[in-house]
UniProtKB/Swiss-Prot annotation:
Primary location recorded for the protein, binned into one broad class: cytoplasm
Domain of life: Bacteria
PANTHER family listed in its UniProt record: N-ACETYL-GAMMA-GLUTAMYL-PHOSPHATE REDUCTASE, CHLOROPLASTIC-RELATED (PTHR32338:SF10), N-ACETYL-GAMMA-GLUTAMYL-PHOSPHATE REDUCTASE, CHLOROPLASTIC-RELATED-RELATED (PTHR32338)
SMART domains: Semialdhyde_dh
Pfam families: Semialdhyde_dh (PF01118), Semialdhyde_dhC_1 (PF22698)
Gene name as annotated: argC2
Protein's name in the database: N-acetyl-gamma-glutamyl-phosphate reductase 2
Keyword terms of this UniProt record: Amino-acid biosynthesis, Arginine biosynthesis, Cytoplasm, NADP, Oxidoreductase
Organism of derivation: Nostoc sp. (strain PCC 7120 / SAG 25.82 / UTEX 2576)
EC top class, as a word: oxidoreductase
Record field: catalytic activity: N-acetyl-L-glutamate 5-semialdehyde + phosphate + NADP(+) = N-acetyl-L-glutamyl 5-phosphate + NADPH + H(+)
Length: 322
């Protein structure tokens, strides 16, 4: 039986390198690569794109659109890791745990968009509550999130790594900073479309002086609701939604052992995995709750999710290579 052929268009980038590393040791697939000198050769790329079973695009948005235009074979499946097609018609959103039946859609699709890192954490927390009517679709959602600097790609990685090398481990000039202050972050449309919310969430991302890891926080002022759910009810609803899932883990409610020194929620604890952990914190007296997702922005937030989606698209056990 022939092994399925996989081509990573953009394998030299941050996500591409991570996916290549995860796939290179596997003996159940055949990786097809392009010579470094021909990475910008449209004819050579088109030849490779149309010769494989699955093409994984790890490219900027415009380059991803160009790559899709080069594919003329209906037998080639495309998994795009850019933001170009995450809200596009004709594309299946590659978050298998998001909805019942999502895996089947991914398995049967020719075109699959790999989710963004921030949206993965956000949707893991909020989608179950909207889908089950625990929160109304009109609920105003705010997201505060922090990612390691690898989320900024090669340029930001080089900036931080260079500073660390020069200063022999000292923190950088920008140990923590928020951005996206024009409220136009490219992930907002994706979050809105796939969450079931009536209005876009207010999203404020940040970058910290650590390489990878991510915390996505959603505060819930439950006192604004006429009959607010308790923190435990919210936790139960999310836990039930993800029952039996391998890569979405709902942490026990009010378990101090999950916190560093009983106080801190560490952004880096699941690095190197394809796991997103969901936490629920609540105070029923003040009618407040906090949802937190913890994930590796390069794992379940990028390359790990891509490998999981690839496995589903090929009809393989989705944990292979993860």
């Amino acid at each position: 039986m022939n092994k399925p052929k996989i081509f990573i268009d953009g394998e030299a980038g941050t996500t591409g390198l991570q996916i290549y590393s995860r796939l290179n040791e596997r003996d159940d697939i055949e990786l097809v690569s392009i010579a470094a000198s021909k990475r910008k050769d449209a004819d050579e790329r088109a030849k490779l794109l149309n010769s494989v079973d699955v093409a994984i695009l790890c490219l900027p948005d415009d380059a991803a659109r160009e790559a899709v235009s080069l594919v003329n074979s209906s037998q080639v499946k495309i998994l795009d890791a850019s933001t170009a097609y995450r809200t596009a018609q004709g594309w299946v959103y590659g978050f298998p745990e998001m909805n019942p039946g999502q895996r089947e859609k991914i398995a049967n699709a020719q075109f699959v968009s790999n989710p963004g890192c921030y949206p993965t954490g956000f949707l893991a927390c909020v989608r179950p509550l909207i889908a089950q009517g625990i929160l109304p679709s009109s609920f105003p959602i705010t997201i505060n999130a922090v990612s390691g600097y690898s989320g900024g790609g090669k340029s930001l990685i080089q900036k931080y790594d260079s500073f660390h090398e020069q200063q022999k481990g000292a923190t950088s000039d920008y140990p923590f900073g928020i951005y996206g202050l024009q409220f136009g972050h490219k992930h907002v449309k994706e979050m809105h479309q796939h969450s079931g919310l009536a209005s876009p969430p207010l999203f404020i991302p940040a970058v910290g002086d650590f390489e990878q890891g991510m915390l996505v926080q959603i505060p819930l002022p439950l006192w604004t609701l006429d009959n607010p759910p308790s923190g435990e009810e919210i936790h139960q609803a999310i836990a039930q939604y993800y029952q039996g899932e391998k890569f979405v883990q709902v942490a026990p409610f009010k378990d101090p052992s999950l916190l560093r020194d009983g106080t801190f929620l560490d952004a880096t604890a699941v690095n190197g995995t394809n796991i997103v952990q969901v936490f629920v914190f609540g105070n029923d007296n003040t009618k407040e709750a906090l949802l937190v997702a913890r994930l590796d922005n390069l794992g379940k937030g990028a390359s790990g999710a891509a490998v999981q989606n690839l496995n589903i698209m090929l009809g393989l056990p989705e944990e292979l290579g993860l």
